[in-house]
Amino acid sequence: MGAGFHPDLTGRDNVYLNGAILGMTKDEIEASFDSIVDFAEIHDFIDTEVKFYSSGMYLRLAFSVAVHTNPDIFLVDEILAVGDEPFQKKCIAKIQELCSAGKTLAVVSHDLDLVSKICDRGVVLEHGNLRFDGPIKEAVKVIRGGD
């Protein structure tokens, strides 16, 4: 997430750059721009260079751009470990919305409560080897030592 953000560009410019990298056309970015900024909640800073953003602001904007690309497959790697609780809830709701729309979500997380909420299948790796692949509730049991 955030691949392609350039620290010397403003949030606005990075939305266009990152959106293009993620496959959006200029027209699609323009049509989604206000929604991207609204979701990220960084209105007052959109014209500030991202090198001055906090890590939370940076990740909010990166997540917002990514979910507005209308992905068929969405990869989430510990993204919700950063950010305040209201924003985390907002992200979870957006992820659930994507899942309800038939999108595929791959989550890398150590937050077992989170994956239990948003996933239906779990893959457990141990030292790079497959330990379990099946229903999320069973995967969580395996992780917690109940296998």
Identify the function of each model-found stretch.
Residues 16, 20, 28-45:
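Conserved ABC ATPase "signature" region
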Residues 65-76:
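A short, proline-enriched helix->beta-strand linker immediately N-terminal to the Walker B motif
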Residues 88-101:
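Helical segment within the ABC ATPase nucleotide-binding domain
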Residues 109-110:
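H-loop/switch region of ABC-family ATPase nucleotide-binding domains
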Residues 115-117:
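A short, surface-exposed alpha-helical micro-motif characterized by mixed small hydrophobic
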Residues 127-128, 143:
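Conserved ABC ATPase "signature" C-loop
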Residues 133-134:
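ABC ATPase "signature
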